[in-house]
Amino acid sequence: MRGPKLQFEHPTQAAASAFLLAAADGDASAMWIALSRETRGLLEGLYAARAGVSLRAAAGVEGGGADARVAEVTAPLRASILAALGAERLGGYGVANARLVARGVAYVLLLPDFGEERVVSQDEWKPSHLLAFVHESREWLLDLAKTAALSAEAGLPDPLGGIRR
């Protein structure tokens, strides 16, 4: 079995950085538009269960800032990220090169306490988490299920796995 293909400049790197910054800033709209359709559906379902509303009423959350529900829907995801990565350290993670696992599936490794942009030596290379993306609608979007599966496969903790009802 072949390992993932390494890509040095890939849209998932910028997407991961933007998503982490949005989570740190509490920008629910930016977080929402960065998520895959499947992940959005999962969060809408969780929102429906928590709010006691029908799935039909919870579906179709818009991320453009006009939908008041987006902050409530993304709150469990943001809480999970802050708990796993640390609110005070969230802006300090480095994002490694993308790894292409399959057509339309890629992930990036997060390096804690990275500091300034630089090339990392073998001794410094200690990834703590990964974020997985799927390519849909011509964009690379963060995917909850792929992040969980690839994190488990890599023996890394799932930064999005702390979501609870």
Regions found by a protein language model. Give the residues of each.
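Short, low-complexity N-terminal intrinsically disordered segments enriched in polar/charged residues
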Residues: 1-33, 37-49
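Polar low-complexity intrinsically disordered regions
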Residues: 1-5, 31, 63, 133, ...
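Surface-exposed, charged secondary-structure patches
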Residues: 2-8, 43-122
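Short, surface-exposed loop/turn motifs at beta-strand boundaries within globular domains
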Residues: 12-14, 24, 93, 103, ...
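Generic low-complexity, intrinsically disordered sequence content enriched
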Residues: 24, 39, 47-50, 59, ...
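Low-complexity, intrinsically disordered terminal/linker segments enriched in charged
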Residues: 99-165
